[in-house]
Structure formats: structure tokens, C-alpha cells
């Protein structure tokens, strides 16, 4: 019997045991639980840095924006004019609003 006939069952068995091809990580939008899962995948046992804003902090920012706007006709500073200067670029802005890479995710690992 030919050699290839004897190797055919072995090759078929190896083909069945081979891991399925996985899609490589491409730059993509990651939000919510998908972002957290990606951080767990990238950071592994090191863990990652995450400090969510408390509800009070968010409310304080909203009040500050209203105070900056002033009453109609007063010519107060518009919050949109200061938004770029006051806003930090966090992981949500990098990965959910914009497209994120593995290297950017690694910046948030411990």
C-alpha cells in the first residue's frame, strides 16, 4: 500500500484537531462589556486601571456647564468652546468613540 494511503487517516485526524482560525485583532470600536473583555484579554493577570466617575462628579460637571453658559443674552462662555480644553482623553474616547488598537489598550494595564 502506498505511503500516502497510510498517512491519510493521520492527516485527517490532525486537520480535525487543528484549532479553528481566529480573526486577528484589528483596530475597532470597543464599548461597554466588549471594552472590558478586550482589556482582560490584553492585560491578563496584570489587570487594568479603571476608575469610574461617581454619579456626583458627573452631576457637578453638568451644573458647571450650565453656569458657564450663563443666562440668555449675558454672553456667558459656552461649554462647547471649552470642551476641548477641559476634557481628558480617556479609554472611552480612544476606544468607543474612536477606533482603538491593542497598543492603546495596553496603556491601561497595571
From Swiss-Prot:
Signal peptide residue numbers: 1-24
Keywords for this protein: Carbohydrate metabolism, Cleavage on pair of basic residues, Disulfide bond, Glucose metabolism, Hormone, Secreted, Signal
Alphabetical list of SMART domains matching this protein: IlGF
Gene3D superfamilies registered for this protein in UniProt: Insulin-like (1.10.100.10)
SUPFAM superfamilies noted in UniProt: Insulin-like
Presence of the UniProt keyword Disulfide bond in the record: yes
This protein's GO CC annotations: extracellular space
Protein name as it appears in the record: Insulin
Organism: Canis lupus familiaris
Gene expressing this chain: INS
